[in-house]
Swiss-Prot record:
<keyword id="KW-0970">Cilium biogenesis/degradation</keyword>
<feature type="repeat" description="HEAT 6">
    <location>
        <begin position="430"/>
        <end position="465"/>
    </location>
</feature>
<feature type="repeat" description="HEAT 5">
    <location>
        <begin position="389"/>
        <end position="426"/>
    </location>
</feature>
<comment type="function">
    <text>Involved in ciliogenesis. It is required for appropriate acetylation and polyglutamylation of ciliary microtubules, and regulation of cilium length. Interacts with microtubules and promotes microtubule polymerization via its HEAT repeat domains, especially those in TOG region 2 and 4.</text>
</comment>
<feature type="region of interest" description="TOG 4">
    <location>
        <begin position="1540"/>
        <end position="1776"/>
    </location>
</feature>
<feature type="repeat" description="HEAT 11">
    <location>
        <begin position="1541"/>
        <end position="1578"/>
    </location>
</feature>
<feature type="repeat" description="HEAT 13">
    <location>
        <begin position="1623"/>
        <end position="1661"/>
    </location>
</feature>
<dbReference type="GO" id="GO:0035082">
    <property type="term" value="P:axoneme assembly"/>
</dbReference>
<feature type="repeat" description="HEAT 8">
    <location>
        <begin position="505"/>
        <end position="542"/>
    </location>
</feature>
<feature type="repeat" description="HEAT 2">
    <location>
        <begin position="214"/>
        <end position="246"/>
    </location>
</feature>
<feature type="region of interest" description="Disordered">
    <location>
        <begin position="970"/>
        <end position="1000"/>
    </location>
</feature>
<feature type="region of interest" description="Disordered">
    <location>
        <begin position="655"/>
        <end position="676"/>
    </location>
</feature>
<feature type="compositionally biased region" description="Basic and acidic residues">
    <location>
        <begin position="1521"/>
        <end position="1533"/>
    </location>
</feature>
<feature type="compositionally biased region" description="Polar residues">
    <location>
        <begin position="871"/>
        <end position="892"/>
    </location>
</feature>
<keyword id="KW-0677">Repeat</keyword>
<feature type="repeat" description="HEAT 12">
    <location>
        <begin position="1582"/>
        <end position="1619"/>
    </location>
</feature>
<feature type="region of interest" description="Disordered">
    <location>
        <begin position="1062"/>
        <end position="1084"/>
    </location>
</feature>
Length: 1776
């Protein structure tokens, strides 16, 4: 072999200390070892250098380690790939075939090398093998990996000669690069220096021809897991980069970076020194300037490592070529780098390495650091030198980074965007659209710093390009799906209007653009729009608002916005404007009116507040569940980390005002204006002064941004805690309505109060009287009127109600909370929420009132009732006589803290909303402020003196002045009956839509569109009417209580030091007598009932924490009489229709009501003080009795362990030792409560493998595991499965003793309908296979069958775990048993996914086995495997066929394979299988077909389970160590161009456009889809099912323009997508042909015809066969003719490929046509003449089938055969 050029290996430069150490390690080398090679000079040079190349033999073992993970092609891959391509040789060239066979299989391939070497001169220095060159290169690569020293030498010599013969011109062949470059780099670590030298020489030649490929391979060597290879590659790199002229054309950026990465590795100091030595030598060869440019491009961290190494190595004596600042590089180095090599800059702005770190999804710290570096980089950015396209790309990068899940990345990206806007200056107008689009992505974020950043961006944009241009683009997002984005858009408009002069805006256009927000479905957006219109009107000036009202008129007429004009006029009448805060946020002038504030007297109630409070445009209160960052603050921009997502409803004023609002003694206020219009469809409830309303403004002096809600974690942790530790300071603070202050002022923190998501997590109004104030048991009185209105709203007391509690001696701090309805959000479901409990407040006076939404007689107060109580429509006065409520809660400039309104109520649009009344004082006066100050100064002793006295004196619930009460009741009822609302209600009748102003609205149950009931309570279970504790579902429907009757049962939580462990009763048990209406949900009840009142005269027997309040009815005969009882205990069903009050069971105290018929006796039956019986409806009683019976049976079935783990028992121990057996739940409580609370206290999950631990007593654990698996409770099943996994991992010997019983139990759970249990069982089986290995052989049949059947599940995580379990089975059990169980379990299954999974894992078994063993004639194996492989190879699924062919491919290397095929494969399948084997020999196996887009796209659709192999990457089900054992090899597939977040965002955008209401938007969406298909096909293909699910509707759009554009677009997309359309072909064809082929529009018909033709031309006709047959059979008219003719065309093309399928499907259509066609050629009912098309189809079939067609027609009815013969040409028949 000729000597290499002498310059390849120059003499070493004066070695540095580091390099001397490196070279000295490998001095022991015998120069004579290369004597057999030519080139003595090179030997000498080689001997010197390769001593260094060899490395330290002491540190590098002589025996080569396996190369499985070193470079691109592992040895296994090389060796196992030879059975394929080798067999692809044709028989034409026997010599080449023989040589390849020698290279593959011969133990000594030297003969082949000599033959190839000898043939080189004849072939001009070329190898030959024109068709098998790739196979030859791979064979040579195999020799380099597995051959001996001599074989490797011959191979390297041959490669060297071949490369020299080819010359130095041209690129390397791709086959050579893929097969040999990795193995050549691996050869650099050879112990033999001669081999290293030869490999280095070849790489040098390759480097001149294809530098990029060689450098990439070298970098892989530098980063290989093999330490010897890394060291050898780093040491030989400088030698490879000689001479210097070679370096001029190389880009060594990545090489320098790879070497620099090793400098900071302290653990491998030797590698670090080697890398530094290589950098030194490369720097000497490159020269100072170029080396500086490379080093300065390093990331700052790597530069620091290099500098430190430089300092430690040389100190101040740095060589000239390495002269750099020892402390770091100068900052001026970076700009010159950009000039030197801009190719290293992404978007010509940021380095490639920084770009890669920005997109690193593995390490968030890497991304955050990269964003910080990007900010620094952008500080020096000069936009004038950057092209427009690069800046757009950079903004696109920032757009994508704003989707990051890490807050710091998003925040930093916004700062970068702001810096970019600043740098661009006036040039930003060219990029205005992309910048705004990026900024809009974060508008939904409620974090304060995020708001500040994007406000800076928008204000800077407005400054540079003007506000109107910015708003024009921004307002395009006013239809955004996220309500917060819509609101923020309006708020930014308000901010700009308040910042810039009106001349800078197009105010009329702005008015029309903002007008749709007035009728938005979300209350907060409507409020923002009202505020914006107030600013617009101010900007326009007086007399110029006609345009404004015209815009409102347009919306009112077009968008069903009845009442919006009145709302705008009312808002303008307030003469107040929003303002900007110091932070630049908008502060509304008008508070968001909660139902509490909207009815209180501090804010004038008008049409604008009514408009905000009402709403018929949202689905329900539950619609906010997914948007619970929405309504956090009234102040736009305030930050709230925990958002309550429940709408609350509190007591208001007007007709529905609470009793204490007008029964307080003293002087009544002067401004008691009557306003009967104030009543809407809101129910009024009382409030507890300890719990702040979620919609109340903060108290005086409290910051507006304080948070009102506790986090969910805290609420879960403090579910049932209660506290009495209130002092005089904390109580008023809580009463002021600011929970943030309550959090800081309460001793022991608010978490001890059990305030779980304050204001957000309570139950139904009529049944949940949760918070009860208590007072002196002997002197103070507690009055309550139960609200029997609709249980649709939840409330906490308004601020006015609470502040009145401390105003003086007559204050009533004992106000209650009457929660109303549940939230259907999963976050607030029973798994996450808890009932509220709070300790009572003490005062001299406790007036505890529960208001009725119907105007009713107020109970008597502490002193003589005021005559003003009779005025039912008057506003209430404050307890001090100074109109306290109205004034202290007047409009403040400080914004209110608002907590999630839910569904808007009303907005029926049936009548105009009255404008705001004039003449109402909106601001507080000095008297109010002084009153509030007095209230805050109450002495502590008032509260402390009552601290331990929690009993409530109910003895005076019997009212003294019955005449006055009755008179007031009659007055109220008369007032209501005479009202206009009552008249309208009568006119509408019982079937009319609910009238929000009618008095009956208080009794209506308001239902939403998507919820069967809003009266159920998700976070509370109930004692039902019978007293039986029962669980209520989140979406439970209303009880079918007989009309005219109503049952009510309300439970109080316990108070005092004992923890409250109660769930409050659900409103399901408090159902209304109502009739369902399609339009209104429920109409008013026609037969109202009367609720009698109880008067408890004795309180001596009341327990310390028990309160019973019984409601007083208001309908029917007002002559109610009191009745007494002394035991405040729960009642339960005992017999007949009565409720005996039983003292033995003492659940949490509550309110117990009863249903009384309209004409029932007014006085309940009283037997004695301890036994009060209340009548109920018999039907209800029967239900309750049955339920109680079932619950008791369930309880009896539970063992003692259940009681020990009972949440009630745990609560008992957590609370206080004072809990006695009397407080234990009744028999009906435990099972339901356990079910409701199990997810709160403990949610069983699948344990990670790393969490498995051994048992101290495994035998007991095994018995317990079997018992748990047999339990009916799914949670216990999960626990049992985890037990089994632990036993398998650590006690396998013990488990083997009961393996059959255990496996049987686990297999049964695999079939469990609960997906969590099923998945856990699948994981458990995988562990059993992994740890027990061949011990599982006897259990394989049942286990594998169950697993295979689960492979057809739609849940991706189930399929993933099944894949893992089966892979574990394949790897660990006996292969023969695995084959048998797989074939038995899934070969003949009907589900396509089961068969695919079976074939996949069967192929894995075959791959693991020796083909010789399979094909050796062993009957058990060959007899089962070959027929199975043949069947799978003919399956309908492409993937299944692939695995079938793979099994054949793996077995066909046996010389007797053909005989085995003939022996074991049925004769009918044999020709097809032989053809398949022949193709495999010629073409190889190929890759697995992916005909259904990317794997990601398929996995996202459960329906595609039959067409895809599920990903084998489990979600934390297995540890990383186990994945090495159980992971299924990934199917090769194209990488998705975008991440999942981008893909999801794209789908939302494109489907939103395609489904838009405006036809122009739909057309734009269609055009956008075409553009994306042309420019970004991978994205479309990856989500093709979701996209075309929206697009298919456009193919038959009602708008002909859209229809035509869609068809024309489809015609253009078909050639682009081709077979990628296969997943959607069945839904696409009906959309194309059903209406369009019968269209009278010639354009649409022609377009549809073109689409069908394009489908036939570009899509596999086999996919079209069945849909075309269906349409030809069932369509009518012209469409039937066209589809029949098109079917004939398909037959001509397809029959040769798929004769059987074509006959099977097409003949059915032909017999249908012939059998129904009349003599005239038409079909009955089909229209049109079908004879021509039928004749064409018949001739096409006859051409392909010949006489066989007539033979098959003979089996049909005679007229069909006759018709067929008539249609066929006579000349054709005569030829037969």
């Amino acid at each position: 072999m000729a000597a290499a050029p002498s310059e390849l290996l120059p003499l070493p430069p004066p070695a540095t200390p580091g390099s001397y150490r490196l070279l000295s390690r490998c001095r022991p080398y015998a120069p004579g070892t290369d004597g057999r090679r030519s080139g003595g000079t090179m030997r000498g040079e080689k001997n010197y250098y390769c001593r260094g190349a060899a490395g330290d033999h002491g540190s590098c073992p002589a025996t080569p380690s396996p190369l499985a993970s070193t470079l691109l092609l592992p040895a296994e891959a090389v060796s196992t790939s030879w059975s394929g391509p080798g067999s692809g040789l044709s028989g034409g060239d026997e010599e080449e075939t023989r040589l390849l066979q020698l290279l593959r299989t011969a133990p000594d391939p030297s003969e082949a090398f000599q033959a190839l070497q000898a043939a080189l001169p004849r072939r001009g220095g070329r190898l030959g093998f024109p068709r098998r060159k790739e196979a030859l290169y791979r064979a040579l690569g195999r020799v380099l990996v597995e051959g001996g020293s001599e074989e490797k030498r011959l191979c390297l010599q041959l490669l060297s000669d071949v490369l020299r013969g080819q010359g130095e011109a041209g690129q390397l062949e791709e086959a050579f690069s893929l097969a040999l470059l990795p193995q050549l780099v691996v050869s650099l670590r050879e112990d033999n220096p001669a081999l290293r030298k030869d490999a280095l020489q070849i790489l040098h030649i390759c480097l001149r021809r294809s530098s990029g490929q060689v450098l990439r391979t070298l970098i892989q060597g530098l980063e290989s897991p093999d330490a010897r290879l890394r060291a050898s590659t780093a040491l030989l790199l400088p030698i490879l980069f000689t001479p210097e002229d070679l370096l001029q054309g190389l880009d060594l950026t990545e090489v320098i970076i790879s070497l620099a990465r090793k400098l900071g590795d302290q653990e491998m100091e030797e590698e670090s020194e080697t890398a530094f030595s290589s950098l030194q030598q490369i720097g000497e060869r490159l020269g100072q300037e170029r080396f500086h440019s490379y080093i300065s491009r390093l990331p700052s961290a790597l530069r620091r490592h290099y500098n430190r190494r430089l300092e430690s190595q040389y100190g101040s004596q740095v060589p000239y070529y390495l002269e750099l600042e020892a402390s770091g590089f100068s900052e001026d180095a970076a700009p010159c780098v950009v000039n030197l090599s801009s190719s290293n800059l992404k978007f010509e702005i940021i380095p490639q390495e920084l770009h890669a770190r920005l997109l690193d999804q593995e390490d968030y710290k890497n991304r955050t650091q990269a964003v910080e570096e990007l900010k620094q980089l952008l500080g020096k950015f000069n936009p004038s030198s950057t092209p427009h396209a690069s800046l757009v790309g950079f903004i696109s990068l920032l757009y994508n980074l704003l989707d990051d899940s890490n807050f710091k990345v998003v925040h930093g990206t916004l700062q970068v965007l702001h810096l970019l806007v600043i740098r661009l200056g006036e040039q930003v107008q060219q990029f205005l659209g992309p910048v705004i689009a990026a900024s809009v992505k974060v508008l939904a974020d409620n974090k304060l710093v995020i708001k500040q950043e994007y406000m800076k961006i928008f204000l800077k944009l407005m400054k540079e390009v003007g506000p109107q241009r910015v708003l024009s683009l921004l307002l395009e997002n006013l239809k955004h799906k996220h309500s917060r984005v819509r609101e923020e858009v309006v708020n930014i408009c308000i901010c700009s209007l308040l910042t810039y002069p009106s001349e800078d805006f197009d105010l009329p256009k702005l008015s029309f653009d903002l007008a749709p927000a007035l009728v938005d479905s979300k209350r907060r957006v409507r409020q923002a729009a009202l505020e914006a219109f107030a600013v617009l009107a101010s900007s326009m000036g007086s007399g110029k608002t006609n345009v404004l009202f015209k815009a409102v008129d347009t919306v009112e007429l077009q968008d069903n916005g009845d009442g919006v004009m009145n709302a705008v006029q009312a808002r303008l009448a307030r003469k107040t404007l929003p303002r900007l805060t110091e932070q630049g946020f908008v502060e509304y002038a008008i508070l968001m009116p909660s139902s509490a504030q909207g009815r209180s007297s501090h804010l004038a109630h008008g049409a604008d507040t009514d408009w905000l409070m009402s709403g018929n445009r949202t689905q329900s209160a539950h619609c906010y569940c997914g948007d619970h960052t929405r309504d956090s603050m009234q102040l736009y921009g305030s930050y709230s980390p925990t958002i309550c997502t429940r709408r609350v409803l509190s007591a208001g004023k007007g007709k529905n005002k609470l009793p204490w609002e007008n029964e307080q003694p003293g002087v009544m206020g002067e401004n008691q204006t009557s306003n009967s219009k104030d009543i809407k469809d809101t129910e009024q409830f009382s409030a507890h002064d300890l719990i702040p309303s979620p919609k109340l403004k903060p108290s005086q002096g409290m910051p507006a941004s304080d948070d009102l809600c506790f986090s969910k974690k805290r609420s879960s942790r403090n579910l049932f805690q209660s506290s009495r530790d209130f002092n005089s300071e904390s109580v008023p603070t809580c009463g002021a309505g600011n929970t943030a202050d309550l959090q800081t002022n309460l001793p022991g923190k608010c978490g001890q109060l059990g305030l779980s998501q304050i204001g957000c997590r309570t139950g139904s109004v009529g049944s949940d009287l949760q918070f009860l104030g208590t007072a002196n048991g002997h002197q103070d009185k507690v009055y309550a009127s139960i609200d029997f209105g609709s249980k649709t709203q939840q409330t906490f007391g308004s601020q006015s109600e609470r502040t009145s509690s401390y105003s003086g001696s007559n204050a009533s701090p004992g106000s209650f909370i009457l929660p109303s309805y549940p939230l259907a959000s999963p976050r607030t479901s029973p798994k996450h929420t808890s009932p509220l409990s709070v300790a009572p407040k003490k005062s001299q006076d406790n007036s505890i009132s529960f208001s009725n939404s119907w105007p009713l007689k107020s109970f008597e107060g502490l002193s003589k009732p005021s005559p003003q109580k009779k005025l039912a429509n008057q506003k209430s006065s404050d307890p001090t006589g100074e109109n306290f409520q109205e004034k202290t809660t007047a409009v403040q400039l400080t914004p209110a803290l608002v907590r999630s309104p839910s569904s808007r109520r009303g907005l029926n649009g049936t009548k105009p909303v009255p404008p705001i009344p004039r003449g109402i004082n909106l601001l507080p006066d000095k008297a109010d402020l002084s009153t509030m100050g007095h209230m805050k100064k109450q002495p502590d002793d008032i509260w402390k003196s009552e601290k331990d006295n929690l009993t409530i004196d109910l003895s005076e619930l019997n009212f003294r002045d019955k005449d006055l009460d009755q008179e007031e009741m009659h007055s109220s009822l008369r007032s209501l009956r005479n009202s206009a609302a009552k008249k309208r209600a009568k006119l509408s009748g019982s079937s009319s839509t609910s009238d929000v102003d009618s008095p009956d609205s208080a009794m209506k149950l308001e239902l939403t569109i998507d919820s069967p009931s809003r009266a159920s309570s998700p976070n509370i279970s109930s004692y039902s009417e019978s007293g039986v504790y029962s669980q209520e579902s989140l979406t439970s429907s209303l009880s079918t209580t007989p009309q005219g009757k109503r049952i009510m049962s309300d439970i109080f939580p316990t108070f005092g030091s004992k923890p409250c462990s109660t769930r409050l009763s659900s409103a399901k048990k408090t159902s209304h007598a109502a009739e369902q209406s399609p339009s209104a949900g429920f109409t008013r009840s026609s037969n109202l009932q009367q609720i009698s009142s109880f008067d408890f005269t004795s309180t001596n027997t009341l327990s310390e924490d028990s309160v019973v309040i019984v409601g007083k009815g208001v309908f029917g005969n007002p002559n109610s009489a009191p009745t007494t009882c002394s035991q405040p205990v729960i009642s339960s069903v005992e017999s007949e229709d009565t409720f005996p009050v039983k003292p033995s069971i003492e659940p949490p105290s509550g309110v117990y009501g009863r249903a009384v018929q309209h004409n029932a006796p007014l006085y309940p039956e009283v037997e004695n003080d301890k036994d009060t019986k209340v009548s109920i409806a018999k039907s209800t009683y029967e239900k309750m009795r049955q339920k109680r019976k079932e619950e008791k049976e369930l309880l009896d079935a539970k063992d003692c362990e259940r009681k020990e783990t009972n949440p009630w028992e745990r609560i008992k121990h957590l609370g206080s030792e004072k809990m006695t057996s009397e407080n234990e739940p009744s028999s009906g409580v435990i099972p339901q409560y356990k079910e409701r609370m199990s997810s709160v206290t403990h949610s069983p999950e699948i344990m990670d493998s790393l969490e498995l631990r051994p048992f101290s007593k495994p035998d007991i654990a095994l018995t317990e595991a079997l018992r748990l698996l047999a339990d009916e409770d799914w949670e216990k099943k999960m626990e049992g499965l985890n037990f089994v996994r632990c036993l398998a991992a650590f006690h396998s010997d013990l488990l083997n003793t009961k393996l059959h019983e255990t496996t049987f139990a686990v297999v049964q759970e695999v079939k469990n309908l609960r997906s969590g249990v099923s998945r856990a069982a699948v994981v458990c089986l995988g562990d059993l296979f992994t740890y027990l290995k061949k011990s599982m052989d006897q259990e394989l049949d049942s286990a594998v069958r169950a697993l295979l059947h689960k492979a057809g599940e739609s849940n991706t995580f189930i399929r993933e775990d099944v894949d893992k379990a089966l892979k574990a089975m394949v790897n660990n059990v006996t292969p023969a048993r695995a084959v048998t169980s797989l074939i038995n379990g899934g070969q003949s299954h009907l589900h396509i996914a089961v068969r695919r999974c079976t074939a996949q894992h069967l192929a894995d078994v075959v791959e693991c086995m020796d083909p010789e063993r399979i094909s050796s004639g062993t009957k058990d194996m060959a007899d089962r495997l070959l027929p199975a492989a043949a069947k799978f190879a003919q399956d309908s699924s492409q993937e299944t066929r692939y695995y079938g062919r793979k099994m054949l491919f793996l077995m066909m290397g046996h010389p007797n394979f053909e005989k085995l095929l003939e022996k074991y494969i049925p004769s009918k399948d044999l020709p097809y299988i032989k053809e398949s084997v022949k193709n495999l020999r010629l073409k190889g196996l190929g890759e697995i077909p992916l005909d259904t887009a990317s794997a990601k796209g398929r996995r996202s659709h459960p329906g595609s389970v039959g067409n895809t192999r599920s990903s084998s990457v489990s979600r934390d089900a297995f540890s990383s160590s186990e994945r090495e054992v159980t992971e299924v090899r990934e199917v090769p597939r194209k990488s998705a161009p975008r991440n999942s977040l981008e893909s999801a965002e794209y789908i939302k955008v494109i489907t939103g456009l395609l489904n838009a209401k405006d036809f122009r938007d739909r057309i734009n969406g269609i055009k956008q889809l075409l553009s994306d298909t042309e420019n970004n096909q991978e994205l479309v293909v990856g989500n093709i099912v979701k996209i075309f699910d929206a697009f298919k509707s456009r193919l038959h759009d009602s708008n002909s323009k859209v229809n035509l554009v869609a068809l024309e677009t489809m015609h253009k997309m078909i050639p682009l997508l081709r077979d990628n359309l296969s997943p959607i072909i069945n839904m696409l064809i009906p959309a194309i042909v059903d209406n369009n082929l019968n269209s009278k529009n010639p354009g649409i018909y022609a377009a549809a015809t073109n689409v069908v033709h394009a489908l036939s031309q570009h899509v596999d006709n086999y996919l079209l066969l069945q849909p075309f047959c269906t349409k030809a059979q069932f369509l009518n008219g012209k469409a039937k003719q066209d589809m029949t003719e098109k079917l004939a065309d398909i037959v001509t093309e397809l029959y040769q490929r798929k004769p059987h399928a074509t006959e099977q499907k097409v003949l059915v259509v032909l017999w249908h046509l012939l059998g129904n066609m009349t003599h005239s050629g038409s079909l009955p009912g089909a229209g049109g003449n079908i004879r021509t098309a039928t004749a064409k189809l018949s001739k096409a079939l006859f051409t392909q089938m010949g006489q066989n067609l007539l033979n098959q027609a003979a089996s049909q009815p005679p007229h069909i055969k006759k018709s067929l013969e008539e249609l066929l040409d006579v000349t054709v028949l005569s030829e037969l």
